[in-house]
Amino acid sequence: GVRLVGSEMCIRDRYETKQTRSFIRVREIHFFEAHTAHADEADATRQIEQDLEIVDNVMRDLCLPVIKAKRPLWDTFPGAWYTIGIDAVMPNGRTLQVASCHHYRDQWAKAFDITYENLEAQQQHVHQTTYGMSERLLGAVVGMHGDENGLIMPPAVAPFQVVICPMIKKNSEVDTVAVAEEVAKTL
C-alpha cells in the first residue's frame, strides 16, 4: 500500500490573554508533528495504533502516567474524523494534554484533492493522520518530577544516574575523595 510520512517542527502563535505559565500555557507554541497519508482507512488506523505505542514508550521513559482517550466531538480537531488526546496526570490530580493523534479519513484529501494512483490505475484519495507533541511534555516532566528542591529526571533521560559528592572534613583519617572514586568505579 501507499504510505507517505513527513515530519514538521514549527512554532505557532496564540493570542493568550490569560496568565501564561512556562511550558504549560504559552503564547508561542512549539509543535513536533508527524503527518501521514495512506492508501486506505485501515492503514491510517494502524498508523494511529503505532503512534500510540510510541506514546507508551515515551511516557514510560519519562515516568509520566497518562490517559489516552478519544475526544468528544466538540473537542475533536477541526476536520478530523476523531482525535485521541494524551493527557499526563499531574501530582495534584489535574491533567495536562501533552500529545494528540488525529485521524482524518479522506476528508482533507477530498477538500485539497490529494490523490494517488492505485494498482488499477485509478485516482484514489489518501487517508491522513497527524500525531504530535508540544513543549507541554517538558512542563509535565518538570511538574511531575520537580519540586522546591529541584528536578530529578527519570533514569531513561537523566544525563547522570548518580552523582557522588565526597564530604571532606578537616583532620579526617579517611581519604573521602579516594573512597568516592572507589565507589564510582564499583558503580
Task: Describe the residue ranges of each PLM region.
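Single conserved hydrophobic/aromatic residue that forms the stacking wall/gate
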Residues: 1-11
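Short coil/turn segments at secondary-structure boundaries
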Residues: 7, 69-71, 152-157
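Conserved thiamine diphosphate
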Residues: 12, 17-21, 146, 152-153, ...
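Extended, charged alpha-beta segments that form solvent-exposed binding/catalytic grooves
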Residues: 12-96, 100, 115-121, 165
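Short amphipathic alpha-helical segments
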Residues: 43-51, 133, 137, 175-179
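Hydrophobic alpha-helical packing residues
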Residues: 51-59, 137, 183, 187
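A translation/RNA-centric and nucleic-acid-associated enzymatic feature enriched
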Residues: 75-154
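Generic long, charged, amphipathic alpha-helical segments
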Residues: 150-187
